[in-house]
């Protein structure tokens, strides 16, 4: 569940949720993503606008909700008990039921088929995909569940939150398509916003804090609280591996600051074996906390078949969270666009975050003989190389 203070932020995912709610599909929608990316707030906002009756059940905060499902004998019994629990009348055809934090009651995901088949109400589910619950959610009944993954706000969402209009974006797209120079004033404004984005990032709570206070210290406090929450999740959801998970998580900023930005297993432990701790890396990725980016033997199609699973970079899900882990002076240096400091890690993290938010699988290419490409992606049947320059190069 997320703070409702970010309810006025425009999110790209809102349109996808609207399409689902306006359709006559006999499916439920599962909205996934890391904690604090804005899932709960957006679903609540869109659901209350689209349906006269909006019923919300949080399996993390409400232990009675978990017991309700576990003791129900069938879908009709569940709906009867749900109506009693929430104290509201469930009106057929006019009620949206929002089941939040479903990782706490993962059986509800596989049972959604029967609730959908019952046909009286519409359903949206949300969860953070933490730990082993991921495989259960992904094995949900085919044909009864659509999945929408949410990410932190991308640069366009951030710019719109800061007042950039459609006209400006139309100008930028037109210049890109026609390979023309962007208006100098527009360019300056967008670069200022981009540098600000590198500090604030895309976590809705951090963005809302900046828009309200325009105080980067307060933004950093919000970011630190999110990082602390992630560490608590690590300890809670995988107690056996929590020490390794914490070490991996804490090492991400320094590993990205190294020359090749690759995650070096020996930096964790001299005898560290990937096979032994593969689940720890997988957990961070599945939780949406980290973005693994794999080296490919050759930058050729299909990239997935060229992937080297033992060679990878590990980015944080949000560039603002990464910036918050570095020394305080980096914020001012980023804002000023100083060129004598290497911001490569921050710029690459922003690029990884943007690519992931737009559905691209993340790869890079590094060969002693042929050189290095920061990212390689598949786009419309082609492999595109991406080189990220922070300004110092």
Enumerate the language-model features and the residues they cover.
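Accessory nucleic acid-recognition modules appended to NTPase machines
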Residues: 208-382
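Interdomain motor-coupling "hinge/lid" segment immediately C-terminal to the ATP-binding subdomain
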Residues: 134-258
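Hydrophobic positions on the alpha1 helix immediately C-terminal to the Walker A/P-loop
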Residues: 42, 46
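Short glycine-rich substrate-engagement loop in P-loop NTPases that contacts/grips substrate
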Residues: 61-92
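N-terminal pre-Walker A segment at the start of P-loop NTPase domains
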Residues: 1-20
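Hydrophobic anchor at the beta1->P-loop junction of P-loop NTPases
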Residues: 31
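Conserved lysine of the Walker
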Residues: 39
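Structural recognition of the conserved hydrophobic beta-strand(s) that form the central parallel beta-sheet
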Residues: 122-128, 149
């Amino acid at each position: 569940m997320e703070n409702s203070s970010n309810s006025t932020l425009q999110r790209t995912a809102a349109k996808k949720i609207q399409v689902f709610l306006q359709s006559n599909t006999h499916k439920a929608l599962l909205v996934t993503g890391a904690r604090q990316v804005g899932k709960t707030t957006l679903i609540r906002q869109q659901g209350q606008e689209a349906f006269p009756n909006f019923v919300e059940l949080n399996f993390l905060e409400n232990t009675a909700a978990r017991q309700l499902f576990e003791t129900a004998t069938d879908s009709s019994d569940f709906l009867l008990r749900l109506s009693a629990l929430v104290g509201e009348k469930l009106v057929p055809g006019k009620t949206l039921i929002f089941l939040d934090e479903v990782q706490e009651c993962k059986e509800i995901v596989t049972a959604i088929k029967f609730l959908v088949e019952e046909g009286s109400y519409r359903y949206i589910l949300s969860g953070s995909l933490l730990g082993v619950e991921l495989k259960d959610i992904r094995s949900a009944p085919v044909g009864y569940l659509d999945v929408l993954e949410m990410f932190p706000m991308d640069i366009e969402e951030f710019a719109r939150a800061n007042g950039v209009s459609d006209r400006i974006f139309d100008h930028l797209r037109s210049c890109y398509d026609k390979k023309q120079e962007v208006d100098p004033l527009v360019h300056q404004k967008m670069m200022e916003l981009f540098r600000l984005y590198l500090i604030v990032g895309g976590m809705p709570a951090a963005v809302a804090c900046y828009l309200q206070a325009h105080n980067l210290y307060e933004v950093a406090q919000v970011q630190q609280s999110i990082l602390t929450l992630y560490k608590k999740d690590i300890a809670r959801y995988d107690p056996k591996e929590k020490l390794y998970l914490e070490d991996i998580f804490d090492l991400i900023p320094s590993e990205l600051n190294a020359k090749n930005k690759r995650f070096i297993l020996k930096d964790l432990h001299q005898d560290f074996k990937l096979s032994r701790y593969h689940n720890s890396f997988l957990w961070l990725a599945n939780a949406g906390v980290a973005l693994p980016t794999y080296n490919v033997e050759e930058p050729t199609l299909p990239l997935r078949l060229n992937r080297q699973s033992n060679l990878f970079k590990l980015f944080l899900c949000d560039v603002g969270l990464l910036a918050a882990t570095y020394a305080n002076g980096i914020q001012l240096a980023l804002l000023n666009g100083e060129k004598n400091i290497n911001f490569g890690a921050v710029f690459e993290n922003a690029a990884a975050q943007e690519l992931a938010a737009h559905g691209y699988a993340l790869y890079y290419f590094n060969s002693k003989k042929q050189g290095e490409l920061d990212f390689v992606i598949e786009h419309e049947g082609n492999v595109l190389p991406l080189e990220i320059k922070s300004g110092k190069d």
